[in-house]
């Protein structure tokens, strides 16, 4: 017997859709207004820099022959499906966990779109201190990291606290 979607964690998928919209809109804006590798300083430690990443986080496997595009696409699809199954099995009241899953799904789908359409992930957020630059990233990466941190945080919450949170207390 199936459950009504609104009673499951899938109710929170609107957050994944929001992440995808904001992510793809920001990337489109950067691609429209910047040349590849163009950098515009905004404040002393933050630039907008249009970059393409053919690998994963920190350009992992970026120097390979192209197979990594499909590998990372498969991972994004697999993780998104797995998290949607977990959301379906959870209740809508499990807000923290479902929001975390939705953030990860939205980020994964935003970067998946880039891989399939552009052949690489579009990055543009560039933090730096003097000549040391943190790897350039995007809104999708940020959503994935926040979602993963929330999953870890949720793991530290006691069952009694989870029950209270889910009741809205």
From Swiss-Prot:
Signal peptide: none
Topology class, membrane: Multi-pass membrane protein
Location(s) in or outside the cell: Cell inner membrane
Reactions catalysed according to its record: Release of signal peptides from bacterial membrane prolipoproteins. Hydrolyzes -Xaa-Yaa-Zaa-|-(S,diacylglyceryl)Cys-, in which Xaa is hydrophobic (preferably Leu), and Yaa (Ala or Ser) and Zaa (Gly or Ala) have small, neutral side chains
Disulfide bonds: none
Transmembrane region(s): 4-24, 42-62, 70-90, 102-122, 137-157
A Pfam family: Peptidase_A8
Enzyme nomenclature, EC number: 3.4.23.36
GO molecular function annotation: aspartic-type endopeptidase activity
Record-level GO cellular component terms: plasma membrane
Family matches, as PROSITE patterns: SPASE_II (PS00855)
Keyword field: Aspartyl protease, Cell inner membrane, Cell membrane, Hydrolase, Membrane, Protease, Transmembrane, Transmembrane helix
Pathway annotation: Protein modification; lipoprotein biosynthesis (signal peptide cleavage)
Disulfide bond among keywords: no
GO terms, biological process: proteolysis
InterPro entries hit by this protein: Peptidase_A8 (IPR001872)
Active-site residues, Swiss-Prot/TrEMBL: 123, 141
NCBIfam families: lspA
Described function: This protein specifically catalyzes the removal of signal peptides from prolipoproteins.
Family: Belongs to the peptidase A8 family.
Protein name: Lipoprotein signal peptidase
Gene that this sequence comes from: lspA
């Amino acid at each position: 017997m199936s459950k009504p979607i609104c009673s499951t964690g899938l109710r929170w998928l609107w957050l994944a859709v929001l992440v995808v919209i904001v992510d793809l809109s920001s990337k489109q804006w950067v691609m429209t207004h910047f040349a590849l590798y163009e950098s515009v300083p905004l404040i002393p430690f933050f630039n907008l820099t249009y970059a393409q990443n053919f690998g994963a986080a920190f350009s992992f496997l970026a120097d390979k022959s192209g197979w990594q595009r499909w590998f990372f696409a498969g991972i994004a699809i697999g993780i998104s499906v797995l998290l949607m199954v977990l959301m379906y099995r959870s209740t809508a009241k499990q807000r923290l966990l479902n929001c975390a899953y939705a953030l990860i799904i939205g980020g994964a789908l935003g970067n998946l779109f880039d891989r399939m359409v552009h052949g690489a992930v579009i990055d543009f957020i560039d933090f730096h201190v003097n000549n040391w630059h943190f790897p350039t990233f995007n809104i999708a990466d940020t959503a994935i990291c926040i979602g993963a941190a929330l999953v870890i945080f949720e793991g530290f919450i006691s069952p009694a606290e989870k029950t209270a949170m889910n009741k809205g207390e």
